[in-house]
Design a protein with these regions (language model features):
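Cytochrome P450 catalytic-core helices
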Residues: 22
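Basic nucleic-acid-binding interfaces
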Residues: 1-19, 28-59
């Protein structure tokens, strides 16, 4: 999955970018308070993308 597609799904679900690290970005879902690291690669493997979406309740 492309990183921009994953970020679009996160924004639609109400998540926001908390901060940018050197290798990862931290996204937070204010509804459940969970923060998840999203790697800064153009292509993110499907299992990892599904895990991130599931943890942030963005499925």
């Amino acid at each position: 999955m492309k990183r921009r597609d994953l970020e679009r799904l996160l924004r639609v679900a109400g998540c926001f970018l908390k901060r940018e690290g050197s290798n990862h970005s931290l996204w937070t879902n204010p509804k459940n308070g969970v923060t998840e690291a999203v790697p800064r690669h153009n292509e993110i493997k499907e299992p990892l993308a599904r895990k991130i979406l599931k943890r942030l309740d963005a499925e």
